[in-house]
């Protein structure tokens, strides 16, 4: 298939991966989203008993633990739970508050998945699913080549948004941990 070139690659087609890909693509970046699974967003699909606990309107930096306490302040000041709620309202997804600011879809988690897919489509995100990454090689110029079972992909940057190992039976893997180790990134 040759080498396909992208400005950014998102690895992991869950909530974080799709949101990141959508935002980058809508800002004019050429983005491809890769996942090893044939079906995207499995954790979204099962969250909240199938109704997706999609945000907590009371989330503050004090709700998060981090080696860098300012990270969460910065992240939440750039994109708040209210910003995500505005996106949900734009798509006319009915929701309700269940407990202490936790918001759930009235109908189905599929509505959030469809919303994120539509946001990716609006930016022209390319998809590679299922696609297994065999190796990540850093180039001399600072870019990367992802060697995959569907051909090599060249990129300036990679976002690893695979989540943790919380639910292996729905496809969670140690991919992010292996990449962190490969590039000597600290794990918390």
Give names to the regions the model predicted.
Residues 25-49:
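Glycine-rich FAD pyrophosphate-binding loop
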Residues 10, 14-16, 39, 164-166:
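Residue-level detector of alpha-helix initiation sites
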Residues 6-33:
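N-terminal Rossmann-like FAD-binding beta1-loop-alpha1 element of flavoenzymes
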Residues 122-188:
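Predominantly flavin-linked oxidoreductase catalytic cores and closely associated redox partners
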Residues 11, 46, 160-161:
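Redox-cofactor binding/interface segments in oxidoreductases and associated redox assembly factors
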Residues 72-80, 99-118, 165-172:
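Short beta-strand to alpha-helix junction loop
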Residues 49-99:
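Glycine-rich active-site loop/strand segments that organize a redox cofactor
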Residues 88, 116, 180:
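Residue-level signal for inorganic ion chemistry
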